């Protein structure tokens, strides 16, 4: 991203809209406000530094200092100084690759979440459309769980009238 593009995007940030559109609350809002404050301070400092003079008055230092040789040497180094340029294309490519992977992962997660939401909607509709428990008949239960019918028939044939584990789980209701 170029410096001009970064500046224009920084100017266009609507902080209030970010908070309201994302529905942020509590600690997130306070963190965002702290970030905004640091951003404003950094912008102010950068502006102040840009407006400071960048020239060195070597004539003044020649008058003030006795050692003219040092001033000449520093002036020569100052004039011959060229800032080192760094090739950041590798880092930018790495960042772009990371960003692409993050977007891909986010889309995959979005798909999973949407599928889960759909499943939950179906479950909710099923729950809302189900008949109340007190209106169910034994035939309805057997239709939903055919294995229970066979299990109950087997228990009746063997003369077992209690469900194994019921008393341990729900307690005994015998009064005597």
UniProtKB/Swiss-Prot annotation:
Q: Cite the Pfam families for this sequence.
A: Mt_ATP-synt_D
Gene Ontology MF terms: proton-transporting ATP synthase activity, rotational mechanism
Bilayer disposition of the protein: Peripheral membrane protein
User: Where in the cell is the protein located?
Assistant: Mitochondrion inner membrane
In Swiss-Prot or TrEMBL terms, this protein is called ATP synthase subunit d, mitochondrial
Q: Which gene encodes it?
A: ATP7
Q: Which family does it belong to?
A: Belongs to the ATPase d subunit family.
Tell me the function of this protein: Mitochondrial membrane ATP synthase (F(1)F(0) ATP synthase or Complex V) produces ATP from ADP in the presence of a proton gradient across the membrane which is generated by electron transport complexes of the respiratory chain. F-type ATP synthases consist of two structural domains, F(1) - containing the extramembraneous catalytic core, and F(0) - containing the membrane proton channel, linked together by a central stalk and a peripheral stalk.
Among InterPro entries, the record links this protein to:
ATP_synth_F0_dsu_mt, ATP_synth_F0_dsu_sf_mt
